[in-house]
Swiss-Prot record:
Residue interval(s) of motif D-box: 55-69
Keyword check for Coiled coil: no
Gene expressing this chain: Cxcl14
Location relative to the cell: Secreted
Gene3D superfamilies: 2.40.50.40
Keywords: Cytokine, Disulfide bond, Secreted, Signal, Ubl conjugation
Disulphide-bridged cysteine pairs: 25-51, 27-72
Domain comment, as recorded: The destruction box (D-box) acts as a recognition signal for degradation via the ubiquitin-proteasome pathway.
Species of the source: Mus musculus
Pfam families, sorted: IL8 (PF00048)
Protein name, entry field: C-X-C motif chemokine 14
Reported modifications of this chain: Ubiquitinated, followed by degradation by the proteasome.
GO cellular component: extracellular space
C-alpha cells in the first residue's frame, strides 16, 4: 500500500514539474543575429498569464542561412527594439517598390 502511495506521489510531482516547464516564457535569451532580408514573418504576441512581457517571434526564409526556423527574441533587449523599428521601416520601403 505504501509503495502504491509513493508511486502516485512521484507521478503527481512529475506532472507538476512538466507543467511548470511549459509555463515559462519562450523569449528568455538573446537570439541569433538575423538580417532584415532573411525575415519571412515577424510576429509580436501579447502578454500571457505565465509571461510578463510580449513575445517577438521571427520566422526566417527557407533560402536564408537559418532555413525557415523560428527564433524568439527577448522583447526588452535594445537590439530587439532596434530590429523591430528598422524591420518595419525596411518592410514599408520594400512594399512601396513592389506596388
Amino acid at each position: 500500500m505504501r509503495l502504491l502511495a509513493a508511486a502516485l506521489l512521484l507521478l503527481l510531482l512529475a506532472l507538476c514539474a512538466s507543467r511548470v516547464d511549459g509555463s515559462k516564457c519562450k523569449c528568455s535569451r538573446k537570439g541569433p543575429k538575423i538580417r532584415y532580408s532573411d525575415v519571412k514573418k515577424l510576429e509580436m504576441k501579447p502578454k500571457y498569464p505565465h509571461c510578463e512581457e510580449k513575445m517577438v517571434i521571427v520566422t526566417t526564409k527557407s533560402m536564408s542561412r537559418y532555413r525557415g526556423q523560428e527564433h524568439c527574441l527577448h522583447p526588452k533587449l535594445q537590439s530587439t527594439k532596434r530590429f523591430i523599428k528598422w524591420y518595419n521601416a525596411w518592410n514599408e520601403k520594400r512594399r512601396v517598390y513592389e506596388e
